[in-house]
Regions:
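Nucleotide-activated sugar donor-binding and catalytic core shared by glycosyltransferases
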Residues: 1-425
Length: 425
């Protein structure tokens, strides 16, 4: 009964969704494009019979990069279709994989749209990153006997409490899933408490630890650092949200009194906020360039606004230390491990609930510095820039946490083998 009500409500609110897409399209025109894909209509052919992977956020897409590359290496004859929900996620997939994968939007959770989609790609296996539990998608896959794996699965106490209110509906939903590969024991226990069977849940660890700085990326970062700031200190503030850019800029202005040649790389989380961040820098009276301009910072450039997609790992490689945003405002923070992979100190605000386990491990190992405002941010950045030993201490411990917790990728790949043809590599 609840399933029918859910589906009926979803059909009823479609006009509101169209209005929302149109309104969002004012700032981000890509939201007004490719509406057909959201209902299972595609203008180009898609190769069927492969692996489908869905990631809703940019962070999930980044975590999926090593997994997709490993699957392509092991099963080169199987097409991989990566689905997202937003233009930002779409851009990230295209910049990460190019033509190596097929990319489309996942249709809304409407039975007819999903049937058109599944008829088109007819996957052998479906992977959903983290916790995107779409009832009609799960039901359609179950009906077609297509294995469904929730990879890198996580479930916060708050989300679990919300799902628990739905009782049997959620239990039925979970038992239609083939395998839940949980990030840690707590996540696994929450899925079981909601109704998943013990043999459905396996703890694999977090895929977010299985990132690495390739030799090619490291070489590119060294070259860019020589071009941009061969004799200047550099710090980076990434994935910033509304309210954080002003804090970062205030800290940078304070730091310039002590380090007149200090360069800040400022990377807002969402592309539609690039113009807003640029305006804040301009209002602060700071000399700036944008990454998209292709210009090289001059000796007088004080800020580079990172307004391109898919370059975050490269930009981390230029910096001496990093502040990771979404953490000074209540957004739960973003992934600190991308900075840690470069063995640089990581600073975050107190709001890190999206990465609670990862941040706890970094904090316990002296790989994370917590700040609360512009003053403490400026103070810690100053200390790190002044003392190379202090800076190296935090950078070394951060990357050690990364290395010590790797292995989730290999464990997940082994779990997927029964659902795929024999690997060729």
């Amino acid at each position: 009964m609840l399933e029918l009500l859910y589906t009926a409500l979803l059909y009823l609110i479609q006009p509101l969704i169209w209005i929302r897409l149109w309104v969002r399209g004012r700032k981000a025109p890509a939201y007004r494009k490719r509406w057909g894909e959201r209902y299972g209509f595609y203008r180009r052919p898609l190769k069927p019979g492969g692996i489908m992977l869905h990631s809703v956020s940019v962070g999930e897409t980044l975590a999926a990069i090593p997994l997709v590359r490993a699957l392509r290496h092991r099963y080169p004859d199987l097409p991989i279709t990566v689905t997202t929900m937003t233009p930002t996620g779409s851009e990230r997939v295209q910049s990460a994989f190019g033509n190596d994968v097929q990319h489309v939007y996942l249709p809304y959770d409407l039975p007819d749209a999903l049937n058109r989609f599944l008829n088109k790609i007819d996957p052998k296996l479906v992977l959903i990153m983290e916790t995107e539990l779409w009832p009609n998608l799960i039901a359609a896959l179950h009906k077609r006997h297509i294995p469904l794996v929730i990879a890198n699965a996580r479930l916060s106490a708050r989300s679990a409490a919300g799902y628990a209110k739905l009782g049997k509906f959620v239990r039925t939903l979970l038992r239609r899933i083939t395998l839940i590969a949980a990030q840690n024991e707590e996540d696994g226990e929450r899925f079981v408490a909601l109704g998943a069977k013990n043999n459905q849940v396996t703890v694999t660890g977090s895929l977010k630890f299985d990132i690495s700085v390739t030799p090619q990326l490291a070489a590119k970062a060294v070259t860019l650092r020589r071009q941009w700031a061969p004799h200047r200190p550099v710090w980076i503030a990434t994935s910033t949200h509304d309210g954080e850019e002003s804090i970062v800029i205030a800290a940078h202005q304070a730091l310039l009194h002590q380090f007149p040649n200090l360069l800040l790389i400022l990377v807002p989380r969402h592309p539609e906020r690039f113009p807003y961040a640029i305006n804040l820098v301009r209002q602060a009276g700071l000399s700036y360039i944008t990454r998209s301009s292709g210009e090289v910072p001059s000796a007088s450039t004080q800020v580079v606004v990172g307004d391109t997609m898919g370059e975050l790992m490269l930009l981390y490689g230029i910096a001496d230390l990093a502040f990771v945003g979404g953490s000074l405002v209540e957004r739960g923070g973003h992934n600190p491990l991308e900075a840690a992979a470069h063995a640089i100190p990581v600073l975050m605000g107190p709001h890190t609930f999206n990465f609670k386990d990862i941040c706890a491990r970094l904090d316990q190992a002296s790989g994370l510095i917590t700040i609360t405002d512009a003053a403490t941010l400026a103070k810690e950045v100053s200390s790190l820039l002044t003392d190379a030993d202090y800076r190296n201490f935090y950078g070394r411990h951060a990357v050690e946490v990364l290395y010590q917790n790797q292995g989730a990728l290999q464990r997940l790949l082994q779990l997927l083998e029964p659902y795929l043809p024999p690997k060729t590599h």
